[in-house]
Structure formats: structure tokens, C-alpha cells
Amino acid sequence: MIKSLGALLIFCFQTLLLTAQDQQATEKVTVVGRMKDVMWKGQLYGNINLDTIIDKKQLYGLGPVEYLTGEIMIVDGRCFVSKVETDTSMRVEETFAVKAPFFGYTTIDQWKPQSLPDSVQSIRQLEDHIQRIVPPERRPVIFKLTGKVENAVVHVVNLPRGSKVSSPAEAHQGQVNYPVQDQEVEIVGFFSTEHKTIFTHHETFLHMHLMTDDRKKMGHLDEAQFKKGAMTLYLPIE
């Protein structure tokens, strides 16, 4: 009897421990694939099928489409994919039926909003600001921004079919840049000091995708001038 009770207690403890570990894992950022393998080794194929992510509720993520044929942005469990149509237009559709060669994602139950300081108007200033306010033990972190940008530039990768890639220059063949001016936007971003060439370019700790509120434009954010007093930064609540 005592042995049976002891075994039951051990089983219950292990179950609780596994449950706690599962909950902890959902709060962390998952990074699949590596940017440098795409840029330098030409590994363009999809390493993750986004349709296979089981828990899509309150999911956030970003990355390129496999074979570098578009951009992906997941906002609050909704997945948006952009593809080049012309030098001045793109197509944005909502679907999880897409694969990515590298991708970062997490589920976030609650956000803590804070006004973006007026001193933060550029991507570099945003990077410095996040590095100051997010302690190392909470990195990598996925965050979001909402509000109005005065000016921004996003790109959508558009590698010609059958292209071989062995350098960043080759990886960006066909890429189209799109301006965004005086528009309300939502930005999903990734910050880490430990993921250069894995999920961020070698010269930055940030990887961000921007989508306009009308959902007519979405892409990788390259340049931005944030409007003073009009942007809100959201960080996950611990």
C-alpha cells in the first residue's frame, strides 16, 4: 500500500514537472534554421511548415518564404504572406500553408504596452532602447510596435526560380523595396545579441517585419522614421 502510494506521488510529481516545462517552453522564442545557411550555403528549402505549428493561438513570428519568394509575418495567430507583383505593388494574403527556410516564433499571452520615447525615431535607436530595457536573461525576445511611421522602407525577397545562392548578394536577387509613408502600421520584431547571422544580419541585433493597417503592404523592415508620440512598444509580460 505504501509502495503504491509512493509510486502515485512520484507519478504526480513528474506529471506536474513536465507540465511546468511545457509551459516554460511556450514562453520562449523558437528559432528554426539559420540565415547564414540560406545566404552562404544556398539551403533555400523550407525547414518548417507553418501549418504544422500546433498552438496557433496568440502566435507571433517572422521569416522569409522558402526559396526566398516572399515574406511571412504572424500576428496574434494570423499568418500573412507577401509576394512581389510589380516594382510598385505586392500581394498580401492570409494563410498558414507556407514553408520557411528559417523562422522565429513564440506564443505571447499578455503584452505590456509602453509609449516609445520621442528620442527613439530610427531602427538603430530602437535597437539601443530595447537593449537597455530588456535584460539578457529575457533574450531573445519577440516584441511588437503599433502606431504611425513618417517614412519606412520594406523589402520583399523575390529570388528568380532556379537561382543558386552562395552569398547575400545572390540571395537578394530580384528583391523589391517598397516605401511606406505616413501610415498606421504594426511591426513584429525579434531582438537578440546572440543570433547574428542565425536570425539577424551580422550588423544588427534586430529582425523586423512591418505591415500596414490596410494590409496592402508587408515586408522585412529596412528603414524607418517613427512618428514622435505616435508609437507604442509592446513587450511580453513575464
Task: State the predicted function of each range.
Residues 161-214:
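Short, hydrophobic/π-rich interface segment
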Residues 82-141:
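Contiguous hydrophobic, core-forming segments of folded domains
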Residues 209-238:
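C-terminal structured interaction module
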Residues 1-24:
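Bacterial Sec-dependent N-terminal signal peptides
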Residues 116-122, 128-176:
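Mid-length scaffold segments of soluble, non-membrane domains
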Residues 69, 140, 205-207, 218:
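Extracellular structured ligand-interaction cores
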Residues 24-55, 208:
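Start-of-domain marker
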